[in-house]
Amino acid sequence: MKPYPIDLVSVVIPVYNEEASLPELLRRTEAACRSLGRAFEIVLVDDGSRDRSAELLQAAAERDGCAVVAVILNRNYGQHAAILAGFEQSRGDLVITLDADLQNPPEEIPRLVERAAQGYDVVGSIRDNRRDSAWRRWPSRLVNLAVQRSTGVAMHDYGCMLRAYRRSIVEAMLACRERSTFIPILANGFARHTCEIRVAHAERAHGESKYSAMRLLNLMFDLVTCMTTTPLRLLSLVGGGMALAGFLFALFLLVLRLAFGAAWAGNGLFVLFAVLFMFSGVQLLGMGLLGEYLGRMYSDVRARPRFFIERVVRAAPSALPSALQRAGFTSSSSEPSTP
């Protein structure tokens, strides 16, 4: 593993109704990036917020001498789609993702950069001493366990988005066009060298989490069905096992009929109905699972954009640091963009 040269660091932050936390987020993230001793940019993506988040992002990007890029989506597309939109607008040799709720401190950014510079393709993180409630922790643990078992990707904390990706991994993820995307798993699928570090975790100071317990369970189902075919294989095993059990049960009923006569077979009518209902339930479950996969395939085949960028706001060229100008930033104001 060779050291990885990092001249420009991009920090991509998806934002959804985080008006209260944005001033502190910008202040702390800029301070952490300045301590790197490298050129940096902060790409903030507004994911269709209903509060004043988009206005605050645009105002931050229009400041003279700042390295903030505001990406405004026309509506809410979800956290991972917003991150991909930020990836498209980033130019860094290393791209770091960070949540806007400040539960993962921006002060951890230098540690991720340090490990990435050692040559790791992906640097993940594990939340140390989580400050979430039990209603958040237990569903999260179930998600981690289910995804680890079904995808085979060895990660300890899928819910922590404080991660670092080298540029080649980001480009590989952008080349994938599937609609349902979970960035940590997708990135690890392309990475050769990965590592994880423990990071601090704080209580949420403003607002509420966007992931409820039910939404976490829905996320687990989405992950399992969009990233692996393991459920289909398990369904095949279950179907084969139930078919064998049904065949053996039929032989058992035949033996009982021959031994005790037709009267006993009549008494076993309800057992047959119970078995029939059980098999019917498994069949319907299998049809629903197949329908889920077919629906995802249909969405991917249509190849519709995963998001639509309404506008991108970045500082004027004269105000940008020279390292950022060399990286290709030439736009001078708010500009419309397409995915």
From Swiss-Prot:
Listed GO biological process terms: 4-amino-4-deoxy-alpha-L-arabinopyranosyl undecaprenyl phosphate biosynthetic process; lipid A biosynthetic process; lipopolysaccharide biosynthetic process; response to antibiotic
Which pathway or pathways does this protein act in?
Glycolipid biosynthesis; 4-amino-4-deoxy-alpha-L-arabinose undecaprenyl phosphate biosynthesis; 4-amino-4-deoxy-alpha-L-arabinose undecaprenyl phosphate from UDP-4-deoxy-4-formamido-beta-L-arabinose and undecaprenyl phosphate: step 1/2; Bacterial outer membrane biogenesis; lipopolysaccharide biosynthesis
- In Pfam terms, one family for this protein is Glycos_transf_2
The residues that cross the membrane are: 235-255, 269-289
Catalytically driven reaction(s):
UDP-4-deoxy-4-formamido-beta-L-arabinose + di-trans,octa-cis-undecaprenyl phosphate = 4-deoxy-4-formamido-alpha-L-arabinopyranosyl di-trans,octa-cis-undecaprenyl phosphate + UDP
User: Where is this chain's protein located in or outside the cell?
Assistant: Cell inner membrane
Picking any one GO molecular function of the record gives: undecaprenyl-phosphate 4-deoxy-4-formamido-L-arabinose transferase activity
Membrane topology annotation: Multi-pass membrane protein
| UniProt enzyme class | transferase
E.C. code: 2.4.2.53
Which Gene3D superfamilies does this UniProt record tie to the protein?
Spore Coat Polysaccharide Biosynthesis Protein SpsA, Chain A (3.90.550.10)
Sorted keywords for this record are: Antibiotic resistance, Cell inner membrane, Cell membrane, Glycosyltransferase, Lipid A biosynthesis, Lipid biosynthesis, Lipid metabolism, Lipopolysaccharide biosynthesis, Membrane, Transferase, Transmembrane, Transmembrane helix
Major place of residence: membrane
InterPro entries xref list: ArnC_tfrase, Glyco_trans_2-like, Glycosyltransferase_2, Nucleotide-diphossugar_trans
Q: List, alphabetically, the GO terms of the cellular component aspect.
A: plasma membrane
Family the entry assigns: Belongs to the glycosyltransferase 2 family.
Summary of the function given for this chain in its UniProt record: Catalyzes the transfer of 4-deoxy-4-formamido-L-arabinose from UDP to undecaprenyl phosphate. The modified arabinose is attached to lipid A and is required for resistance to polymyxin and cationic antimicrobial peptides.
Q: Which PANTHER family match?
A: UNDECAPRENYL-PHOSPHATE 4-DEOXY-4-FORMAMIDO-L-ARABINOSE TRANSFERASE, UNDECAPRENYL-PHOSPHATE 4-DEOXY-4-FORMAMIDO-L-ARABINOSE TRANSFERASE-RELATED
This protein is called Undecaprenyl-phosphate 4-deoxy-4-formamido-L-arabinose transferase
Organism, by scientific name, is Pseudomonas paraeruginosa (strain DSM 24068 / PA7)
- From which lineage does this chain's organism come? Bacteria, Pseudomonadati, Pseudomonadota, Gammaproteobacteria, Pseudomonadales
